[in-house]
Amino acid sequence: MIYVLLFIVLVFFSVQVFSLGIMLVHEPSVISPRKVYPKISILLAARNEEELILRNLSALEKLNYPLDKLEILVGNDASTDNTANLIEDFIKDKPQFKLYYIDKTLGKGRGKANVLGQLAHHASGAYYFITDVDVKLPKSWVLALLQEF
């Protein structure tokens, strides 16, 4: 079961990286409005990312997507710097964000795969999107990815 979950997470990550690459080369100038906004779970693994974490969280906060249909799950992977404190301070009074402290290993998963696998267990969205702390996300990121569904 864990291998299936990790495989799914890795497939989603690969599709997302490919889609984001296409968006960065040519971001759609017109994104059709949706009639239905499905619930989206965004998974973000963070380990010792104090230099970039606030930029990424700020970009996620500014996404053009209804807040009640969005959950952003951040997994702090045993950071030894100030990453966890920065995340905690940023997400106060932002119910769409949830921070999870990852201190155990799920199955044989290690590193980022372990963090994403554990976050996937907490996610409740119809779609899971995975990003990385060092990715610059455009406001239209979620809507652009949903254009394909």
Which residues fall in each region the model found?
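N-terminal membrane-anchoring/stem segments of glycan-assembly enzymes
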Residues: M1-V36
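Short, well-formed alpha-helical segments that are part of the catalytic scaffolds
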Residues: I22-V30, E49-L63
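Cell-envelope/extracellular polymer assembly enzymes that use nucleotide-activated donors
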Residues: P38-S41, E71
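Donor nucleotide-sugar binding loop of glycosyltransferases
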Residues: E49-L52, S79, P138
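Acidic donor-binding segment of Leloir-type glycosyltransferases
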Residues: L57-T105
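Acidic donor-binding/catalytic loop of UDP-sugar-dependent glycosyltransferases
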Residues: N82, V133-E148
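Glycine-rich, basic loop-to-helix element that forms the pyrophosphate-binding segment
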Residues: D103-A123, A144
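Short aromatic/hydrophobic "clamp" motif used to bind/position activated sugar donors
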Residues: Y128
